[in-house]
Amino acid sequence: MRKKSLYKMFIVAGVAAMMMTGCGSDKNKDTDTNASKTEAPADNNEADDEENYDTGDASLDNTRNQDEIGENELLVVSFGTSYNDSRRLTIGAIEDAMEKEFSNNFSVRRGFTSQIIIDHVKKRDNVTIDNITEALDRAVDNGVKKLVIQPTHLMNGLEYDELSEEVAKYASNFDKVAIGEPLHTSDEDFDTVMKAITDATKDYDDGKTAICFMGHGTEADSNQVYAKMQ
């Protein structure tokens, strides 16, 4: 699996997912929160606030924690969100796109980095989502030999570092392990993302609609990606 091929699929799927959940114009007034690329401070607010309204049908989301993985696995790692519709239309859309592209060679599975989100979904909806350790244990138990991990993180922040450290502990259990880079890594990545979001939002360029892309930021030096995108 070539890195650029995976990058392209990640970017296109990610932009498509954002558009499916609304851009803030009259064409779609519903708003969702996609926390898959954020840092930990969002956990408590999301888990507490959503109890006041319906977040969608959890049963429609494929948690991708099934066994019978095979020898090759593509593990898609996200921060996670407990908003059911948002999880299905954003994180799920990225996973579905990767499965469509690489299903001949890899089984696609899911792992979330936010344990608070995982616990909240389990308590509220009785839906089980693997954390990173559980996802890696599942890969080992299923005899996976080649493990490719693609995070949906926006930048090389604290969570990406923690992911890399956790994966390193399991490296000896596989014949080959590869971890994809975050969305914004090289100058070429920035150009690709800017073109993708411009193309995806061009129908809203009517001189009246403002589109704002938001992120929670990070304490890591990689927070500079926001200024660079501006």
Indicate where each model-derived feature is located.
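Active-site-proximal alpha-helix that buttresses catalytic centers in soluble enzyme cores
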Residues: G24-Q230
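Alpha-helical transmembrane segments
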Residues: A13-A17
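Bacterial N-terminal signal peptides that target proteins for export
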Residues: R2-F10
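C-terminal motif of bacterial Sec signal peptides marking the signal peptidase cleavage site
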Residues: M18-G22
